[in-house]
Regions:
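Extracytoplasmic
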Residues: 3-20, 28, 51
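Residue-level signature of mid-helix packing/kink "hotspots" within the transmembrane helices
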Residues: 13, 41-49, 132-133
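Extracellular/periplasmic helix-loop-helix junction of adjacent transmembrane segments
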Residues: 18-45
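Conserved MFS/SLC helix-loop-helix module at the cytosolic interface between two early adjacent transmembrane helices
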Residues: 46-84
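Cytoplasmic helix-loop-helix junction between adjacent transmembrane helices
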Residues: 90-127
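Helix-loop-helix hairpin linking two adjacent transmembrane segments in secondary transporters
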Residues: 124-171
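Flexible cytoplasmic inter-helical loops of multi-pass small-molecule transporters
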Residues: 167-190
């Protein structure tokens, strides 16, 4: 699980790490770089509570793979973006991937904890922090020397993550009936 949360942040942290490349290739000014950041953050942060309002009532086991799929499309678009508006679309897709991925992945970490919720959340956070730290290093060694098109190599990691997350989603789907039983009992006691 820690590796699945590490994968998402490492891909997301590529975006700010390649700002110098994007600034050079597209002749962007600081305001445009700021708009890329704003676009990513709005979708990654502000969209997430809306996703949670829905998934708290209706768990979506496949949202991990779907979120990573959005990130994958964003990466591919970023690797081939011919213009600033397309860069913004790519940033929005990567941010949307994060917003969709993280609520259910946090819930799955708790579910897989075996009752050790604090430990599970800590491992989840460590995975994310390792991912966030590794993204800029990967960008420095892979993308910066080879250019924008090399971003597509990270799509391979996203595809592998989608397969792994699909398997985790299948496991999670099997757990959902067990989650509903205690909630139904608690609702019965409250009535």
């Amino acid at each position: 699980r820690a590796t699945s949360d590490g994968g998402s942040p490492s891909i997301q942290s590529l975006l700010p790490a390649i700002y110098p490349l994007l600034k050079s290739e597209f002749a962007l000014d600081s305001g445009q770089i700021g708009l890329i950041t704003l676009t990513f953050q709005i979708t990654a942060s502000l969209l997430q509570p809306m996703v949670v309002m829905f998934t708290d009532r209706h768990p979506k086991p496949w949202s991990l793979a779907v979120g990573m799929g959005s990130t994958l499309i964003g990466l591919l678009l970023l690797s081939r973006a011919p213009s600033f508006p397309v860069l913004l679309m790519a940033a929005a897709l990567i941010g949307t991937g994060s917003a969709v991925f993280h609520p259910e992945s946090s819930r799955i970490a708790r579910l897989a904890s075996g009752g050790r919720h604090g430990l599970a959340q800590s491992i989840f956070q460590v995975g994310g922090n390792i991912g966030s730290a590794s993204g800029p290093l990967l960008a420095a060694f892979i993308i910066m020397p080879r250019g924008q098109a090399s971003i597509a190599w990270f799509a391979l990691a996203a595809m592998i993550a989608i397969i792994v997350l699909g398997r985790i989603g299948r496991w999670y789907q099997l757990q959902i009936p067990n989650l509903r039983r205690p909630a139904m009992r608690a609702a019965g006691r409250a009535a």
